[in-house]
């Protein structure tokens, strides 16, 4: 149903990877401009990304400030959870990559699995990293959007 809706209405839905959110929080102008450019598009993130952000906040020098930024982010984005379908896709992807002698971090594979299951375009600066996953749609918002 989700794929049909996207085709009918031409809506692209996005899943922000951890690096894209970090670029935004650090004031990257291109990422911030893309967020504004896509303000009317559904933009989501994954619970795994939040885990990585919390880890980074707690190991940082500015724990309180970084935690506050994450709390604000949680309120402004829909958070995709890891469901049974994503778990199965994760296992399949990890197996396929290992058979070809390639590996990706488990968290990255889970994020990719969530994007695939929910038919979301993964917004990341790690395009080389994720392009090994067949069928995964990618976007890089560290480049300025075309008007």
Regions from the PLM with identified roles:
Residues 2-11, 78-125:
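Active-site neighborhoods of divalent-metal-dependent phosphate/nucleic-acid chemistry enzymes
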Residues 17-18, 53, 90, 115, ...:
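Generic structural signal for small/hydrophobic residues in well-ordered secondary structure
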Residues 34, 47, 69, 76, ...:
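Residue-level recognition of specific faces of alpha-helices
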Residues 47, 83, 126, 142-145:
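Residues at the C-termini of beta-strands that transition into short coil/loop
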């Amino acid at each position: 149903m989700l794929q049909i809706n996207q085709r009918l209405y031409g809506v692209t839905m996005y899943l922000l990877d951890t690096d894209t959110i970090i670029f935004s929080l650090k004031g990257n102008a291109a990422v911030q401009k893309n967020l504004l450019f896509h303000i009317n598009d559904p933009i989501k993130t994954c619970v795994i990304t939040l885990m990585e952000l919390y880890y980074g906040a707690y190991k940082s020098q500015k724990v309180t400030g970084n935690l506050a930024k994450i709390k604000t982010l949680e309120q402004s984005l829909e958070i995709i959870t890891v469901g049974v379908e994503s778990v199965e896709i994760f296992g399949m992807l990890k197996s396929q990559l290992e058979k070809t002698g390639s590996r990706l971090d488990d968290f990255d594979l889970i994020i990719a699995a969530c994007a695939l299951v929910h038919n979301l375009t993964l917004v990341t600066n790690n395009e080389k990293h994720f392009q090994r996953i067949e069928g995964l749609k990618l976007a890089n918002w560290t480049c300025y959007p075309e008007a």
